[in-house]
């Protein structure tokens, strides 16, 4: 038995293989002649044997088992034949593609087999050359002048040449024994012998032979026994043979003659007679005798001749296996015992009176039960892992089971299915055992797809499970071995890894088995991935694999890192494949869109344009062209463009004179209302740094356009008076005029940038004058220079900051913050740092954040550290520092300082002073605030009772406040300082107080007490909303809270931006609340939207008593969609259903939609889609599709609009339609896909014009839509007409293919027009075949596995047969080496369509076979055999599965026995799936004449597969020999060996018998 641990087996251990001994049991024996060995020369014998050896043992039944259980043959040991080395067999020299080599490629020998025809095997042998060249001359040499004597015909053995050297004579009679017996005539040793055993031409004289009688004729002519021929045959036998062959029985007669000749040749060429051996009978023995017999069987020295007389009864099934394992019976002898037992069991079924059908069914049942016993026995041994001697037992069982399977002593199909199921369900601990058994079944498993694909999936699943476990030594070894096995499997049988259902599950696992850094491995995994991607459906929400340059620019600008380093951002934009003009236009579009928040993008664009203008780009022209093109675009906000131009003019980076010349040259300045943005820009140019003549020209053009310059001057004066009214100490110079008609702060933001710029510079000048006027100096402890101290008070700073922020001129605010950072007032410093925190993004874009932060740190270094407010300053600095990547050391230093001051102010002191701390503060005292401030700054600490007293006093005072004011803000600051002393106690007190306040009646408005607490940090938005959510989910708390819906609206009201104007002046606390609210909207917009959704659950959002939510929803939607991207459209609609109506309103505001309904609004939304508004348009489209106000008609019109949009985008090479459809409901994608499928099936197959491919291009466009929306195809089976429609379309294509092939045979190809027309038709067929293949692959769920619907199965089998016929047509045979894309590229220039096509016709044919694989996987065995039989019986030879290895791999072998027994039913059923198909297929000529021998078999290399049943002179099916009867016969003599010897070891040659 060959060891399973061969080097080729990828799952075996590295033990050295056992040596294999070859033995023969062919039943041949050598009868030697009586020639004396001394008369021959050994070298001559060896040379002759090597020259003319005919190996009679070269059969297909040699075995690798040294313990081959066969009988001994008769051997003549007197033959002295040199032990020459056996020549290799050329027929088995091909390389085995399997990674396993568990046995020789030669199948095992079967002894005692029935006789069959050896004609094909023996026909290859024969003597070449003349007989004289083969037989050496044994006569002495003659002189050169004389001719050689003729060779005697009976001289077969070579004779030794006489030596020319004289040897001394030896007296041979010396010492000779005198013969005392009478003389007896002996037959000459060299005489030829008849088959009957009599010598040729040897008749000793006895007197009764005709030669012994002397006659006149014998005396004259001699005696001879030659038969006298009546006449010479001078004529040919052809006429007489023709007469016989023309007769109706001539062929039968000729067949009989040939059969008789073959039988004679077989009988004369046999060395021994026919075997009469029968399986040994079973007898009942005692237990002792049975054990003795079994021990003798386990002993190799006991010959089987003695044991084969009888075998013990009762050894069967599980008992037989146990005995073989327990007694370690050699594998060969154990197999012999199994055969004997099986032969007796099967022979018992063949009783008299039992029909052949019942006998066959009983035999099949017995073999199946025996196989189940073997499987259960193996499983029991596997589960006994860890027991003593388990390793040796397991090794024996594996080898024994493998030998039984190879000897075909098990049910092959049942055994393979059992192994696959066991491997699939095996735990990781026993996986190496099953992998070691895999080699025995490897060839049978991977031969056909039926079991090759499940094997690939099982191995990939095991590897995926192992890789998910924690790393360990054994796990890594198993994973490496399994990876190598899978890689080898995928390389040798890639078709088994075409996984239409599980490819995306195992793709990453399979990729890990290959080394992607190697080009060869990368190519293999890429090819396998491409094959699978052609037959799988698209993933839902699949984004385009490559972004357009404009999308890449938007991503760069939206990224958070874009503000940190402008050099990186600039180089990133310039490195894109985008021309400079389009790049600047895209940046201006990003700046001016209403779908982005914040003013930082203006300063980002300003710095980029300054940099690029210095590099030579024409930025001015791009800005003017942008204003001209985007004037009427929805979502366009020109205010940001005006701000951008203002900043560029300030830095002298915009040519105002050139712009004015452009206006005059174009005649754009007209008195129109409204004013065009290109002209409106004149009203936003800053006056400073412009020459007087340019400014005068600007005024002239504005006057011509109808703009009142006096109104502009009056607005400047009014604004200055308003600011002077708010800052009388800073702006000391009075402004002429009264204070009547002053406008609100909101009016400041509506001013044009000419006024804003003028006012901003004016404020900055007065702040500088105020600083110089009240400048103080202080000693610097770090160096000798004095420190200049700013004299701005907190109130003054609050007013200046509020005015500048209303103006939106943050670059001027940065200059003012530079002056403020030198103040010694800690409140001013905290406010300045809070301003940095709120406007951090804008200051980053300006490039001033880092310098301002360093200035604030310098102010922190000189501020009074004894004030408890120092903690607030450090906290504010920390928030700013964490937004600067380069300030990590400073952040660490600030954290240490914060920890230090926390410990300083939280030190608890247990003393009489601390016991009376709470009593020393009286809330009714006018000096309450000052006393509390002194108490908190004392640093003496505070215990819990005193903290409770002070907290109660502060909370009562805060609750009494009717509205937020300076008093409530001061109380909130005291509470934050109180929290510093003991944060844990304070937080518990705060939670209790908030709960009690919410339950109080009447409940105070949240705006009265919550904004100050949030501003100082005692409460956060997240914590407060979470607390409310927990209270409302608790039944006990919910019942005690009144007006829950009103409470929710108050919570939403806290997030409204307009609240800051309602809170009054913006001081330290209010500004911090503003900052906190902005951070919550930015980072928790999703939670805020959920809060709105809960508030709108039971309340009408249009109620007049509720605050307006549209501006807040606009802000939340912008923030959410920018964070989530296009996929967030579906998320918002699905998770916030209560906000649908108000989201509609907010999107109408953002998109600028007017009062449109239905299809008109949908068309407007689709027209607004661009890179910036995509997410918002998607949400709007989904809402419109879900709303469906007009029923099915409106939905159908929307679907029709989206379908046309998709078609147009594909023609233009865009993929934006895919992003639109991926976020819409699956129902919408389903409708659009069905529309595309109907369009494909309605197109004609062949274009009317020979030079255009309109129908083919349309088909590819519609196919692209179907592919991208294929995720809408249900995986579950649903009855539809798609299968029948695809079958009809494929049949028409097959018909066109056959007609084209016939036309090409009868057409003069030398004609240019005909050749061109046929070429166009072939290309059209190729395109349509690809389109239909993709549709079939995408709709693979048309027939589910194990479907009982005969109609659906017929649709699938019909498609399967049609695809096979088209793919094997001559069209693909002729064009197999030609490129497909280069031929098709003549009718379309769309790269997206060309990329989806296969590269060559060979790849298209391969894709067709892969699609067939998807269909075959869901078919039952009966349906698969039906398709294969149809291709074999009704189609040309080139379509026979046995003639094409790829078709044979798909369909598997045809079960001939079923086709014989159910001939009538199968013939009736095969006509169903292929109606009207035969006449078209049979007319197709074969692409080649190289066909294989008919017959589909499981083992193509087995010699027994050539045996056939014959009935009435016709082959009706194969004749498989029964493996249970393949036993060797008993040896007639007793010898030293117990098995026959392979004659090939001795280099013997065939000797002809007469």
UniProtKB/Swiss-Prot annotation:
Residues 1-73, 128-173 are annotated as: Disordered. One of its GO terms (biological process) is regulation of transcription by RNA polymerase II. Keywords: Activator, Nucleus, Repressor, Transcription, Transcription regulation. Pfam families: ARM_SRB8, Med12. Coiled coil: none annotated. Signal peptide: none annotated. InterPro entries: Mediator_Med12. Residues 13-26 have a biased composition (Low complexity). Disulfide bonds: none annotated. GO terms for molecular function: transcription coregulator activity. Residues 32-42 have a biased composition (Polar residues). One of its GO terms (cellular component) is mediator complex. PANTHER family: MEDIATOR OF RNA POLYMERASE II TRANSCRIPTION SUBUNIT 12. Belongs to the Mediator complex subunit 12 family. Component of the SRB8-11 complex. The SRB8-11 complex is a regulatory module of the Mediator complex which is itself involved in regulation of basal and activated RNA polymerase II-dependent transcription. The SRB8-11 complex may be involved in the transcriptional repression of a subset of genes regulated by Mediator. It may inhibit the association of the Mediator complex with RNA polymerase II to form the holoenzyme complex. Component of the SRB8-11 complex, which itself associates with the Mediator complex. This is Mediator of RNA polymerase II transcription subunit 12.
